[in-house]
Amino acid sequence: MTIVEVVVLSASSGMLRYRTVSDALPAGVHPDDLALHLSGLTLCTPGATLHSTSWRFASESVVLTYAALPDPSPSATVPLSPDRMVTGHAALAPSPPSVDTDAVAAHAARHLALLAVTDPVIAAAASTRPDLWDLLTKLPTGVAGALR
């Protein structure tokens, strides 16, 4: 089974916050379409951004993770822990034994921080939402793993 998970980002009191939503991918549906539906974003949302950031194997399913912003319903959010990262234990065993939601959200946010300075489409969207992107672009732009 494939699960589509969306980390929906918002800002409050100068802090990045997030919530996650997910659902099983129905047959014949593109993951991007389900992620857009789950995010609640529309083509009319100023600065709307949806980007695939990672995948992992969990509970007999492949989980495709997307980052989305701005959150159209920023209730029940939690603070983003941008330094929360997990890594595999060996070069030939890249998957960490477990990946918690905070690590997934941190990875997604750092991925967007990198795209803000490398992808002109994302940079254009970012220019319309400085309240969120100013916070995102302060994050380290490493997207996978970290040297400790």
What are these language model-derived features?
Residues 16-23, 27, 56-67, 73-148:
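Nudix hydrolase/Nudix homology domain
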